[in-house]
């Protein structure tokens, strides 16, 4: 691996700004690393090498002229395949969109380009972001760089694997029920799910509109802080976007543990023992440093997964109705009959998991079952929000493992969707409540597989969230050794 890619993100940024390395050198190192390891990892669906090199050369030219667009000018960032980039295929890892080229940029893409970031599209994902393992892609299964026989998490597994394998220093994913945090946990990364509405969803292909959020990945915390500072902010093109004071990365300071009230949860027998051990180790260190640990009752949140899957699949059923072979999506016209065109296009275009969720959502929205399922789920969602409000009247943050286990083997849970859904047991409630949360590395198990810790804070407290994450990174046993050789 090129020595450049061994540098921490902050050192890479400083080296670009000081002229120690050029963007062309950095981008070339990324391309060579992708050529070297992505045949095994399969993080990228496609990369236009010529285009990214041209962008890097333009960045270097700006710096030579003393006109860099920002301190990030020339920094590579990978983009998940459901975030639109003009004149670039945005397939959502689905056959139905395999030839769709977006005619516009997503807002987050515009913001990245304005700052001079070099875009590396497109990273693999679960089809239409529906999955927890990236096994549901219509094109390939992404593998975990720590163990190629295991999953990287999902649905943003391609973005997470690309960063963990040192192909790129930064990446964007999307999080509907844990799709940034869970892959971050399983790949040893920092991964942020922002407060709902603080990052524009314009140009993000919708799965569940009331739950989706775009979020960053990085091997170091500062990468997530910097990306969030760039992509956050009000956007008039997104009706759910919220106006807030501009977040500044320079305002983030390490949180003093003394007097910090930390909500903690009780571990249950089905949680992997090494996850419990790592969690307990963190809590013991916090107690020693003066934090107050407050037990919170998470028993009601056992309903979060069924609530989430009723609401998410209902919104999925509505959002994906546009992919019919006429408005959007590949057209399969075998008989010349309009109804057959719809059926054939969707039958051949969607994969099994997407079809399953469309059916679930259509059922819960049907006239005879709407109140019993969707209506009840929305009432329960409001109760989850109130429960979090109650928690945060007593604590400053909640700490819990991001995932109940480390990365499982490819194919281990594909035949049992319920077991797959349970991987999101601690992440879905955060999306239902619209809260900010972040997965941070919490060491590794005996096999060297990463374990993640989830930090949750009240709405709009990303600054505090980052401060807590920064302080946690100094604790014993939190660091991850990333693999250099991947075979």
Swiss-Prot record:
Gene3D superfamilies: Amidase signature (AS) domain
Protein name: Glutamyl-tRNA(Gln) amidotransferase subunit A
GO MF term list: ATP binding; glutaminyl-tRNA synthase (glutamine-hydrolyzing) activity
Gene: gatA
Organism: Leptospira interrogans serogroup Icterohaemorrhagiae serovar copenhageni (strain Fiocruz L1-130)
HAMAP family: GatA
Keyword list, A-Z: ATP-binding, Ligase, Nucleotide-binding, Protein biosynthesis
GO cellular component: glutamyl-tRNA(Gln) amidotransferase complex
Catalytic residues identified in the record: 80 (charge relay system), 155 (charge relay system), 179 (acyl-ester intermediate)
Domain of life assignment: Bacteria
Protein family (similarity comment): Belongs to the amidase family. GatA subfamily.
Catalytic activity reported: L-glutamyl-tRNA(Gln) + L-glutamine + ATP + H2O = L-glutaminyl-tRNA(Gln) + L-glutamate + ADP + phosphate + H(+)
GO biological process: translation
């Amino acid at each position: 691996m090129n020595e450049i890619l061994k540098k921490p993100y902050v050192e890479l940024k400083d080296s670009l700004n000081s002229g120690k390395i050029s963007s062309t050198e950095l981008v070339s190192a990324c391309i060579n690393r992708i050529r070297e390891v992505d045949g095994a990892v399969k993080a990228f669906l496609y990369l236009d090498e010529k285009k990214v090199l041209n962008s890097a050369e333009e960045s270097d030219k700006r710096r030579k002229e003393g006109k860099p667009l920002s301190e990030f000018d020339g920094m590579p960032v990978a983009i998940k395949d459901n975030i639109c980039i003009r004149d670039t295929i945005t397939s959502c890892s689905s056959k139905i969109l395999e030839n769709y080229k977006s005619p516009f940029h997503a807002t987050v893409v515009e913001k990245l380009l304005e700052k001079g970031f070099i875009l590396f599209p497109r990273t693999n994902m679960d089809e239409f972001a529906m999955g927890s393992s990236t096994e549901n892609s219509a094109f390939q299964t992404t593998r975990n760089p720590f163990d190629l026989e295991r999953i990287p998490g999902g649905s943003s597994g391609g973005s997470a694997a690309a960063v963990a394998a040192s192909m790129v220093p930064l990446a964007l994913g999307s999080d509907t029920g844990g799709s940034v945090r869970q892959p971050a946990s399983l790949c040893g990364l920092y991964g942020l799910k922002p407060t709902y509405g603080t990052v524009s969803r314009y140009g993000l292909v919708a799965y569940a509109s009331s739950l989706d959020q775009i979020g960053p990945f990085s091997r170091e915390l500062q990468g997530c802080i910097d990306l969030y500072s760039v992509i956050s902010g009000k956007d008039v093109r997104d009706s759910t976007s919220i106006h807030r004071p501009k977040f500044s990365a320079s305002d983030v300071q390490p949180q003093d543990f003394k007097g910090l009230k930390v909500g903690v949860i009780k571990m249950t027998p089905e949680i992997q023992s090494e996850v419990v051990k790592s969690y307990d180790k963190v809590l013991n260190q916090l107690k020693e440093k003066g934090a107050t640990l407050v037990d919170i009752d998470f028993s009601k949140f056992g309903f979060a997964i069924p609530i989430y899957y009723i609401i998410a699949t209902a919104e999925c059923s509505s959002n994906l109705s546009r992919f019919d072979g006429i408005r959007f999506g590949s057209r399969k016209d075998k008989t010349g009959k309009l109804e057959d065109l719809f059926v054939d296009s969707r039958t051949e275009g969607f994969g099994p998991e997407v079809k399953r969720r469309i059916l679930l959502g259509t059922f819960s929205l049907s006239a005879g079952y709407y109140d019993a399922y969707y209506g009840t789920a929305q009432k329960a969602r409001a109760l989850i929000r109130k429960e979090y409000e109650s928690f945060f009247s007593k604590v400053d943050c909640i700490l819990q493992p991001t995932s109940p286990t480390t990365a499982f083997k490819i194919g281990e849970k594909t035949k049992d969707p319920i077991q797959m859904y349970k991987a999101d047991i601690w992440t879905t409630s955060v999306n239902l409540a619209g809260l900010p949360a972040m997965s941070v590395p919490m060491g590794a198990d005996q096999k060297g597989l990463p374990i993640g810790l989830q930090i949750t804070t009240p709405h709009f407290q990303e600054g505090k969230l980052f401060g807590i994450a920064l302080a946690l990174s100094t604790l014993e046993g939190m660091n991850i050794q990333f693999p250099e050789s991947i075979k």
